[in-house]
Amino acid sequence: MAVPHFSVSVVARGSGRSAVLSAAYRHCARMDYEREARTIDYRAKQGLLHEEFVIPAESPEWLRSMIADRSVASASEAFWNKVEDFEKRSDAQLAKDVTIALPIELTTEQNIVLVRDFVERHVTAKGMVADWVYHDAPGNPHVHLMTTLRPLTADGFGAKKLAVVGPDGNSLRNDAGKIVYELWAGSLDDFNAFRDGWFACQNRHLALAGLDIRIDGRSFEKQGIELTPTIHLGVGTKAIERKATTDDQAVSLERLELQEEKRAENARRIQRRPEIVLDLITREKSVFDERDVAKILHRYIDDPGVFHSLMARILQSPKTLRLERERIAFATGIRAPAKYTTRELIRLEAEMGSRAIWLSRRSSHGVRKEVLEAAFSRHSRLSDEQKTAIEHVAGAERIAAVIGRAGAGKTTMMKAAREAWEAAGYRVVGGALAGKAAEGLEKEAGIASRTLSSWELRWNEGRKQLDDKTIFVLDEAGMVSSRQMALFVETATKAGAKLVLVGDPEQLQPIEAGAAFRAIADRIGYAELETIYRQREQWMCDASLDLARGNVGKVVDTYRANGRMMRSELKAEAVQNLIADWDRDYDPTKTTLILAHLRRDVRMLNQMARAKLVERGIVDAGFSFKAEDGNRRFAPGDQIVFLKNEGALGVKNGMRGKVVEAAQNRIVAEIGEVEHRRQVMVESRFYNNLDHGYATTIHKSQGATVDRVKVLASLSLDRHLTYVAMTRHREDLGVYYGARSFAKSGGLIQILSQKNSKETTLDYEKATFYRQALRFAEARGMHLVNVARTIARDRLEWTVRQKQKLADLTQRLVAIGARFGLAVGAKTTNSQNLKETRPMVAGIATFPKSMEQAVADRLEVDPGLKKQWEDVSTRFHLVYTQPEVAFKAVNVDAMLKDETVAKSALSNMANQPESYGSLKGKTGLLASRADKQDRERAERNVPALAQSLSDYMRQRSRAEQCYQADELAVRRKVAIEIPALSPGARQTLERVRDAIDRNDLPAALEFALADRQVKAELEGFARAVTERFGERAFLPLAAKDTNGETFKTITAGMNPGPKAEVQSAWNTMRTVQQLNAHERTIEALKQAETLRQTKSQGLSLK
């Protein structure tokens, strides 16, 4: 039994749920949600195995006619839409939702019969409609059951509450004389009876299936099981206890020994599972290099060989993904280490983003307009921008973000928002990474707050849990790691709470920190606060507020009316017009920016804009500068952008500046504004992450403010990107677009108004890992071209390696198989005449480790090879001054792969050992006696080194062949299929099993021998079972059922699917082996009797 799970919840509008949406999801179907005039489509969801829509026997005619001639899903759609239409309240309870785990011991057909029995006894018998589906998740088969909360009447539905009838037939009244009512759908006592009824029904069906299993659904306490937390006294605690009876020196030595014990144990654990190191590193940083791995290993590993072996295993682990290759920087000649991350982190961040999008599309935590107006009236000094931000965070969506610099009024805004939430009946709590920030949030905004770690601790202890009436405000969100942010997003999602993220605009920049906050803000959008409105014109300020509220259509009309929406027929014409207008309006005393969403557009616009300035003589052709992405030319007056953080210069990724001096591979740039303005000198050999800054992506402009902005609109824009692009200016804004492409896609306003368009295909279950990796790198400001090339090249090289490995392995396996008499013969079948039958237990054809990996693992622990390698290592140390350098030069790996290379290397080593490195000691007149002795010793050991290495390679080759043969035999064995039995054979085996249970083995054998065809089929079945599992695998007492040790041993390492197949076929395989054993016993007795009679006859002749 996976889990004796039985949970009941209510589908209620108050919690943002819908009966139609729930039904569509469970039926994996497309349904029309009539109340909201929209369609829900879950047809892509998988796992639906069976579905039924069952009505009570005495159902009214309207219900019968409604579902007549409809499919199950269609009947469900029609019924729950009627329920939704009947319930008028905004917080109406619509249905009871029951989730039940099914016993994995039963077959699919048996589980369906079980659920039908339960529904008939405990649901429809009480006049309830039962809409249920069977989901077959691997290892977790379960049922979702939706039932009604109102009785059915002739024209619709009755009341949810009914008067309790007393013994006299009249309505029961309480002491105050009022009529007592009860819920028609049942109270807590009814729920307990409902739950107990399920377990009773389940146990009955388990017994009918011949399974000696009973499920007790009660709590541990009610079962009399005393589960108390145990206290683990570790070695450190014991050392402290012993300290009281020892002197100070003894305690000190004892603690040192304890430290070494811990290091040794950690070393062993890392060797068993090197991925522990990845877990340690990724708690601190999401992108790392070899040095980070080495730092962790150095804490615990002393042996150089083990150290380097673990380094290789970690960096080549399937869990590791290389984002950028190691490379020599062209401009500096400095070697940049390769950058890595883990697949788990990429998937975690992608899932976090998907959850954030899901929350943003849920409407459950809205605050009524009159409540907001009351809050605004109490805070008369709120600006329009602050009010707009409050409206944004107080919206119905279950997640929201707000951005504002320190002093921009975030605290005042959050205080007013808290009052509005509390007035609407919500509990508001907050958290921050640092205690000081949490304290400030509580003191200034009145939001009860703790550190994030404190919240996690309380949740793990079952305290202070969030619920669907909780608003959680997370301050300084840009400081929170992806892992921790993912936890809070997941917690809010599961608890039904609302999450409000508060951050700083600097944290929106694509730098190394704050990637989690950016990943969410980019997906859901945000409200923005500024101490001073950017726009100078009032109509522009009003338009920015409308953009913040999502009124994109109104804003487009406003800007069009003011001549700021520049229409062209084609995008190419729009680009030309944009550059022409930018050139005409260019004023060196004003800050300007061209914005586009696509990088290729940005690169083109930068080139065209600078070309115009050079053409007019505003800037010179300039001097060449070796930038990371190729040569650029810079001259005084050029606008530039920094693309990487550099503390020594005081610049950050996305920061803009203006060149004031330029020379070959050197510039002086002015950065900052007003009193923070300063100059920095940049030389390409020290910093080369620069580009022209006339145009930039909309993402990089987040948090920026300039005088004039030109925007190139594209079909990839959405509501959030439009908001960012159209609110960066102080004085003027122009939007340029090609009308033809927008017209084909629904129109300009529709495209600019769409929500999360760039995420409409982002589904964590289906999104490609490649795309997730690029988004992960983008959020950290990495060079996407380099990342894409690295991933693609690594994938290609891996594929080529696997192809060659497969070819080499095939040749080796054929040779080994022939040597061990395992020749492979070819079979031909007529596929048209062969009727495919699914086996009872499928053969295993895929394995968690490749053949090469499995053999390598055994070679790694081979004691003979270990001893031989120690001799090789010792000889290297005796012969060479730098043994590790010489070992690398010898390239043992290449020798192991190619016998010709090995012979050449061994010959070279014996005759010219100096070619691999300097020998130990010295010769000549100036050499000391010790040096001469070292050289003599080295020369004497050269032949021994070559011989030791040759012996090691020969011994390893033999061991490798042996292990390959063993592994091949094991894999061929588990690849054997256990065939399905015909109905006649199954019936015969059932009769055999009954006879065995009656201890009537002769009758069992008689049944088996009665039909020759069935007998032959059972013999083939038994042969397959023996070949795969062994002749007596199912005969011991421990193999009586699947609860014994035999089952655990046989299924060790299996995936849930194959394990379930073995479990299902267990009794059949055991029966056939018992039958075979009885046959062998009878045959042995016959032979013994024959031999006895022969001997007796021989004696009588004498």
UniProtKB/Swiss-Prot annotation:
It comes from the Bacteria. Gene3D superfamilies: 2.30.30.940, 3.30.930.30, P-loop containing nucleotide triphosphate hydrolases (3.40.50.300). InterPro entries: (+)RNA_virus_helicase_core_dom (IPR027351), Bep_BID (IPR041533), Coronavir_polyprotein_1ab (IPR050534), MobA_MobL (IPR005053), P-loop_NTPase (IPR027417), TraA_Ti (IPR014136). One of its GO terms (molecular function) is DNA helicase activity. Keywords: ATP-binding, Conjugation, Nucleotide-binding, Plasmid. It holds the Pfam family Viral_helicase1. The keyword Nucleotide-binding applies. ATP binds at G404, R405, A406, G407, A408, G409, K410, T411. Transmembrane segments: none annotated. NCBIfam families: PRK13826.1 (NF010402), TraA_Ti (TIGR02768). Belongs to the MobA/MobL family. This is Probable conjugal transfer protein TraA. It comes from Sinorhizobium fredii (strain NBRC 101917 / NGR234). The gene is traA.
